Structures are given as structure tokens and as C-alpha cells.
Amino acid sequence: MAKKDYYEVLGLQKGASENDIKRAYKRLASKHHPDKNQGSKDAEEKFKEINEAYEVLGDAEKRAAYDQYGHAAFEQGGGAGGFGGGFGGGGFGGFEDIFSEMFGGGFGSGGRRQRVVRGDDLRYDIEISLEEAVKGCKKDIRISTLAECDTCHGSGAEKGSKVETCSHCHGSGRIRRQQGFFVTEAVCPSCHGSGKKIEKPCKSCHGDGRVQKAKNLSVTIPAGVDTGNQLRLSGEGAAGENGAPAGDLYVVIHVREHDIFERDGSNLYCEVPISFTMAALGGEIEVPTLDGKLKLKIPAETQTGKLFRVRGKGVTSPRGGYAGDLICKVVVETPVALNDEQKDLLRKLEESLASKSKHRPQQEGFLDSVKNFFSNLGKH
């Protein structure tokens, strides 16, 4: 089945900005997160699609390659694999690997080196609150992974059983065949790539040397992380074959939406409602921050939509020590559920202001613009 266009997966056009991509990813990842859609295979598949699309479009180099070549940029033989080679220890071989496949072995190896396969990289998606993302936290997680077999300690053989070098591939785990000027290489059908023959395979792991296990880990999440950030836990992935190194675990961060604050990079935004009398006369109000409340002075004649910046009350960057700002947007509330006396007072206030344009500069400016518009319209 052909892969969907990554821009289409995130609901974006090809020319979308980095912020557009990030916002779309946050929204969709939160909507389709497995924790919110337990048991839904459709949501799980959609979540995987969204993450795959963001891994490419969220990286400038990968996005450029995708824009030029499409999905072909990431197929075997070209392009880049997610997380430095992709989940599964695959990716692209180096110069030596290419020559090994073509001419029968690494430089100076003689083609008899036992195959060493690093363990798979694993991915774990975790959802945290905005407070946890801003201040940092520790999270206990439980993952399922391939671990070294406790019974045979990774050998794949029962205790006392013989483990011999495979006579078919001489321990390399690969079979080479020459066809004219070319040499092809394939996994040894006798030992299935292990390079060894076991007399009595371990009953616990069936000769693989690894078993599926649940593992508990404590993850330290640094302050300042955001949705899409990845934490690499070296060696916490699946165990490798034949004693090879384990892969890595990548913990992918998802920050839940907050009831009060919205985050954009290092800055936090919130809307603060004030009464129309406070807006007209000025005063002092309390505004929330992630560290508690603080006082904010509202000058007289404040209009709705005015922004107030509280420096240093945003998010501290994990790369530096720089803290962003809290930006409060004032929203002037219209009074509701008025009694007759209150309505009369407002009517009297309106009458006292009606003939004086200086009291309503925005309205007068708007009316002047409308008059000019229609005046110019009649000249054409």
C-alpha cells in the first residue's frame, strides 16, 4: 500500500512553516494518543502515521529530502532513517559494509567474521503536563523488550550443550555466491545468521539467547522539554544478537494542553478577563503563573486585546539558562444579568459620552474610515 503524503497526514500544505508543522503535530498527537483511545487500532495506526510524518517534516534536512524526492528519499539505499538509522538497528551501512556485501568481507576480515547484530532501538511515547514539561520531572515507565536469557546467559544453548562453529558458513553467518564478476551474499540457511550450531538449544529462549521481558525504568525529563522532543536512553533498547550491544530507547515527549496557558517556544500565553470599569479607570489584578500568582497593574483606558509582558515567567530553555516570558492578553468583559438600576446608570453614562468623540477613539476612527471608503467608492 502506498504511503500517504506526510503533509496530508498532518493536514498541511507543502509550504507550511515550522510552527505550523509543530502545532499540527501537537494537536493530532494529543487527539490520537493511545492513552486517550485505548483499544482502538485505528487510533494506534493514525498515531504512528502522525509520528512518522513529524519525524521527517520536523527535521529541516529530512524535510528538504522529502520535498525533493518524496518517500523514495527514505527507502533502503537513499535518504535518512529516523533516530539515526530507524527503529530496528537498520539504516545505511558504511563504506566497509558496501564493500563487504560486494566482495566478500570487511577490510582484512577474510570474510570469516561472525555476524554481530546490534539490538533494535525502541520507542516509548509519554504524555506529561505543562507544569512537568516546564519544571522537569521523573517518570517511571514499563517497557516490553528483548533481554538476555537468564537461563543460558545469552548463549542460546542448554547447560553443558556443545556450541560449535557452523560448518556451512564457517562462523560468518553469511553465504557468498559468485555469479560471473559479481559476488552476492545471503544469510546462512543452516545457522540462520548466528554463525554457530547448538547441539541442544535452550528451552527458555529456543536458542535465540534472548527472551521477551517487561522492564521498569526511571526516566529523568529535563526542564524545558516540548512536544516532539526525544530523550535517548543508551543501551536500554533490545538486547543484541550473539552478545552484541543493546539498542537504545527513545522516549518521545507529548505535552498535554493546559486549561490556562498556551505555549509557543519559550513563551507562555494566557487571557485575563477584566471588568470594563477596571479597563476604563485602571487598577491592579492578580494573574496566574506556573510559580503562583503575581500582581499586574492595568493602566487607565486599557483596550481589550492589549498585551502585557511579564519577563522571565515563561519556560527556561533546556539548552541555556534563558527563560521566556509570560504574555497576558486582556479581555474586557461586558457586564451581564444587570438589574434595572444598573441599566439606568449605564444609559446615563452612555448619554454623557455620546457627544464626545474623544471618549471613544477607536469607534470614531472606524466611522471615519467607513466614511472615507464610501466617499472614495462614489468617485470611481
UniProtKB/Swiss-Prot annotation:
GO terms for molecular function: ATP binding; heat shock protein binding; unfolded protein binding; zinc ion binding. It is found in: Cytoplasm. Residues 5-70 form the J domain. One of its GO terms (biological process) is response to heat. Pfam families: DnaJ (PF00226), DnaJ_C (PF01556), DnaJ_CXXCXGXG (PF00684). It comes from the Bacteria. CXXCXGXG motif repeats lie at residues 149-156, 166-173, 188-195, 202-209. Zn(2+) 1 binds at residues 149, 152, 202, 205. Keywords: Chaperone, Cytoplasm, DNA replication, Metal-binding, Repeat, Stress response, Zinc, Zinc-finger. One of its GO terms (cellular component) is cytoplasm. Zn(2+) 2 binds at residues 166, 169, 188, 191. Its cofactor is Zn(2+). Binds 2 Zn(2+) ions per monomer. A zinc finger (CR-type) spans 136-214. Disulfide bonds: none annotated. Participates actively in the response to hyperosmotic and heat shock by preventing the aggregation of stress-denatured proteins and by disaggregating proteins, also in an autonomous, DnaK-independent fashion. Unfolded proteins bind initially to DnaJ; upon interaction with the DnaJ-bound protein, DnaK hydrolyzes its bound ATP, resulting in the formation of a stable complex. GrpE releases ADP from DnaK; ATP binding to DnaK triggers the release of the substrate protein, thus completing the reaction cycle. Belongs to the DnaJ family. Homodimer. The J domain is necessary and sufficient to stimulate DnaK ATPase activity. Zinc center 1 plays an important role in the autonomous, DnaK-independent chaperone activity of DnaJ. Zinc center 2 is essential for interaction with DnaK and for DnaJ activity. This is Chaperone protein DnaJ. It comes from Actinobacillus pleuropneumoniae serotype 3 (strain JL03). The lineage of its organism: Bacteria, Pseudomonadati, Pseudomonadota, Gammaproteobacteria, Pasteurellales.
